[in-house]
Amino acid sequence: MDPSGLDTRTAERFETYLDTIGVTLRDKRQRASFATYATGLLGDGSRKSMEPMAARASADPALTSAIHHRLIHFLGSSAWKDAPVRTAAARYAVDELERHGPISTWIIDDTGFLKQGKRSPGVQRQYTGSAGKRANCQIGVSLVLANERAEIPVDFKLYIPQSWADDRKRCRAAHIPDDVGGESKWELALDMIESAVETELPRGVVLADSAYGHNGGFRERLDELGLDFAVDIKSNASVRRVGSNGRLGKPTSVKALARRHVSKFKDATWREGTKGPLRGRVLRMRVVTADSQYRKQSKPMWLLIEWPEGEENPRNYVLSNLKEKMPLEEMLNICGNRWRIERSYQDLKGQLGLDHYEGRSFVGWHHHVSVALVCYAFLAAERARSFSPCGTVTHAGRALEDAA
């Protein structure tokens, strides 16, 4: 979306929006650089790194160089905090999204940032779903809020592996603070969730894959925060089935439990995903976890298993503390909302240059991501405005989608 090509009202909203978010920055030079950078990320051009954005900002070579250096300073050296900027953007978008329905889910996942060299903070050979294999990359963990209509990414943290944390010289070269590094991805996710709770963003059911949900400490902390969750666990997770009389069965893996009750799976169809309606055979039962390390989770929870027709093994195992009387269809719809985080990654990378940052600074990476989140929040709010209460897209909304 090229800001210069917006209709008058949308352009005015964009300018006012930048002013609103800019209040969280310390001085007018930061606010000016912030506006330039945000306009560059939202603007035309296939490459959203600093040099080409500076070139598009001015046809004068001398001025282009000055803009480029100003943007480098803004991202890498200027002292401003990411959290207030991200929170202000999240509130702006959430206010508009909730006109069309309450926030219903908080989605946790991570995405890869492919790299060539070894000096970008956190880079190493590691698995990323972005490539579908191990690759030289950085990993960013994110939190996305979503309702029935749309999604808004509100926070991101760069994963710094233990191999980096053990090399403080390397960390200092990448401007990684001394107290950062070695945290697991699920711990980074909890940091973001706790911040969202503290800033009183509207709550939703926490969704996550097994990289997060399999960890008992992750689930226990969600429960302590008073958050509902429906998270994937691995097939070797040990549980005890709760019988109709309340008695507990022997500890067994969820995979073995699925095979023991294969005749009880039922066909189900739930909401649209990225590739159309989601269908599968599912089984739901009450269980307690058999992990003695997390005794607080000894209360009954739902185990939801998906086993597609014709496949040798079940595909997903979901553990949830959602209410006991929740209808199966409602639970399936909630769990099916996790695909929205993938769409946010597609838009952040495809439209807003999320993975175009070429600097080698931990602070710079987070500053770049913050401005990308600000831009996404504006787009999300504009898209929400383009829908009438009955769910039809207005002419202005179609124009905005075409321009995006």
Which sequence ranges carry the predicted segments?
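Conserved, well-structured functional cores that handle cations and Mg-NTP chemistry
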Residues: 1-207, 211-231, 235-238, 245, ...
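Generic structural signal for hydrophobic core residues of well-folded globular domains
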Residues: 41-45, 57, 75-78, 322, ...
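Active-site-adjacent bridging/hinge elements
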Residues: 118, 345-352
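An anionic, glycine-rich sequence signature occurring as long contiguous blocks
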Residues: 149-174, 178, 230-340
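Short, solvent-exposed helix-loop connector elements
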Residues: 217, 320, 326-335, 350-366, ...
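Hydrophobic, well-ordered secondary-structure elements that form the walls
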Residues: 342, 374
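Conserved nucleotidyltransferase catalytic core and NTase-mimicking acidic/glycine-rich helix/loop elements
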Residues: 379-404
